[in-house]
Amino acid sequence: MEAMLEADRASAALGIELVDKGAGTATCRMTVTGGMVNGHGTAHGGYLFLLADTAFACACNSHGPVTVAAGADITFVAPAWEGDVLRAVAQERTRYGRSGIYDVTVSREAPGAADTAGTARVVAEFRGRSRTATPVKRGEAPA
């Protein structure tokens, strides 16, 4: 997973960093810069998707074999602003054979980002569907 992320020039160009990892999980962080802001003054959804997709890629590649996205979607819940530090936490939901499903929560971590309960404000929810590039033999037990 580390080699994949080190070779990921798109994520590096945006300052995305891997801050935590485990089997089927990954946490990435990114600061929203002025170049990431859309015409409404909020973080462009494409950058939020890219952050979530990077965490997804790290989580689904944490098992070793090369794994790619088969599809993904995102729901934007709240805006993020220039200067916000965003955290994307990816969690494996299920994996069988060559397929997997991962959920990623993107939250604001910048000062003032907490909701009334004092917790990080969710900005977006992402679901990724993965496909391992190596074949699975018929009759193998689920992973």
Go through each PLM region and give its residues.
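A generic structural signal for short beta-strands and their flanking turns/coil linkers
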Residues: 12-14, 24-26, 66-72, 84-86, ...
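Short, charged/polar surface micro-motifs in flexible loops or helix N-caps
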Residues: 23-24, 33-36, 54-56, 82
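Hydrophobic residues in beta-strands and at strand termini
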Residues: 30-32, 76, 132
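A short, polar/proline- and glycine-enriched secondary-structure boundary/capping micro-motif
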Residues: 38-41, 135-136
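Compact, glycine-rich, soluble single-domain proteins
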Residues: 40-57
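Hydrophobic beta-strand-centered segment that forms part of the acyl-chain substrate-binding groove
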Residues: 57-87, 92
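HotDog/MaoC-like acyl-thioester-processing domains
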Residues: 79-82, 91-143
